[in-house]
Amino acid sequence: MLRDLPRRVIIIGKSAIVATDAFLLFPDAVDAIVELPKTDQGTGDLYSLLLPQLADGARTPEIPSIEEVVARNPDLVLMKDFTYTGLGDKLTAMGIPVFTISLEMPEDWNAELRQLGKLVGDPGRAEEVTALYQERQDKVEQAVSDVPEQDRPKVLMMRVSSTDGPLTYTVAPDTWMQTRFVEDAGGIPVWLGSGFKNKGFAKISFEQIAAWNPDYIYIYSYKDPAEDFLTQLKKDKRWADIPAMKAGRVKAIPGDFSNYAQPISRWILCLQWMSADLYPQLFPDFDMEREICSFYEDFHGLSDPQAQREIIDRYRRSVQAN
């Protein structure tokens, strides 16, 4: 623990958007941020709405040098745990406090937000936020818990990407949040137990997808709009024979400035949307746009009508191909 509350905070390393999202759940600590890291994954920057006073300024390099960190005179450095070796350990050796986070699973958010709350002197806010997450999770769990195993749909949740060539399909390891999304939403992840190690996304082929024959296929992307890839799949003659495509059950997971299918603060919206899509009869009053607006107001204090309209407009574009 720090002797004093942090006054100069910087966030560094790959996936810095995860740590930034978490820190911004504590509004009374936001003024301590010296400058923002890179938070635009390729589809826009939410922080132009959340922190306009910092969003247009200089950004901390993703992998700064020791000298660049020291020049910013931080009394706290936040980073993802997998980026600690090689930079965080050197900063620690120099006496600069470093707080690493995982936030790869729902339970990580509860535990680590409590740690972060103590660090910034606002444990009450940590309890408030974890309770808000739990409330939304409980609604999903209570709705789908009685669905028998044999009645649960087979689901493929895959990341789609392209670099000036054919589309690439990948799935997350069994132990990552994407797998939990499907399980907690009441589905059966078709890739579970396929031998993919916890070392990152694993590439899969079209033939493997066809062999799995999932009832639902949900696609997502971080650097590009997932809906653009969905449009491409719908035009692909090979995909026309996939039963899920014939049934209209190949869909893009929504987002706004970022896709919801990742461990950012908005991960809960992915879980809510997926469960309502799998079981519309269990969520007859579900309104995704209402859930998005209440999320931003409750979790990030964003109630400005114009800002919320921009977020909803982005959400609508993300699902327009569904």
Predicted regions and their residues:
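Proline-aspartate-enriched helix->loop->beta-strand connector
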Residues: P6, D56-P61, S65-F82, I96, ...
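Residues that mark the start of a beta-strand
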Residues: P6-I11, A32, P97, R152-M157, ...
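A short, structured surface patch at a secondary-structure boundary
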Residues: I12-R72, L76-F82, V190
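Short, structured coil segments at secondary-structure junctions
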Residues: A29, M94-G95, A185-G186, K246
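His/Asp/Glu-enriched short active-site or ligand-binding loop at hydrolase and phosphoryl-transfer sites
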Residues: P37, T175-N198, S221, A247-P254
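Extracytoplasmic substrate-binding proteins
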Residues: L87-L167, F201, A252-A321
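Pocket-lining segment of extracytoplasmic ligand-binding domains
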Residues: M177-Q178, V190-Q208, N213-E227, T231, ...
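Active-site/pore-lining binding-face segments in mid-to-C-terminal subdomains
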Residues: Y216-L278
